[in-house]
Regions:
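Bacterial Sec-dependent N-terminal signal peptides
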Residues: 1-33
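Charge-biased low-complexity segments
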Residues: 21-167
Length: 167
């Protein structure tokens, strides 16, 4: 019985050490990415990084709360999306159709954006040229945005948005 407990404890320690090693390896892979604005498909295809693994490094900010999510937290997420729209407008980006967008911000403990994952949804997709311009605007936008709600650990927040046509 005692030997079994020691073996189980040893396996648990090895599993924990392996998990930490994998997280460190993933963190180093993320640091080497040439961009902080990317789609999950590009992340998998070009860099062999699975977004599920990334979420272990950046657990949802919502996990910090019990049954009640503070309105101030939700307001910050809304501000992220609204300010993103302002950044696109200030960059004089134009588009003729509405685009639906899934997005996930990955934030440091101080609220600065470390990575921005996105995916366009639905049948109407932007042209590759427009999407490239979108990525450039987002790269600049995330340099200055700060999520002003104290979580005090790395976290992520996802949601969807609709980019209305600029007719």
């Amino acid at each position: 019985m005692k030997k079994t407990l020691i073996t189980v404890a040893t396996i648990a320690v090895i599993a924990l050490a392996t998990s930490c090693k994998n997280e460190m390896f993933l963190a180093k892979k993320l640091e080497k990415l040439p961009t902080k604005v990317i789609t999950p498909a590009e992340l998998r295809k070009n860099y062999n990084i699975n977004t599920v693994a990334v979420e272990k490094l950046y657990p949802s900010g919502l996990e910090s709360f019990g049954d009640t999510i503070p309105q101030a937290y939700l307001d910050e997420w809304t501000r992220f999306i609204m300010d993103m729209g302002k950044a696109l407008k200030e960059a004089d980006m134009k588009w003729e159709k509405d685009y639906r967008l899934w997005l996930r911000g990955h934030y440091s403990a101080d609220g600065s954006v470390e990575y921005f994952f996105y995916n366009f949804l639905g049948q109407d997709m932007p042209s590759p040229e427009w999407e490239a311009q979108f990525q450039e605007v987002m790269k600049e936008y995330i340099k200055t945005f700060r999520f002003n709600y104290p979580i005090n650990r790395k976290f992520s927040q996802c949601g969807s948005a609709r980019l209305q046509a600029t007719k």
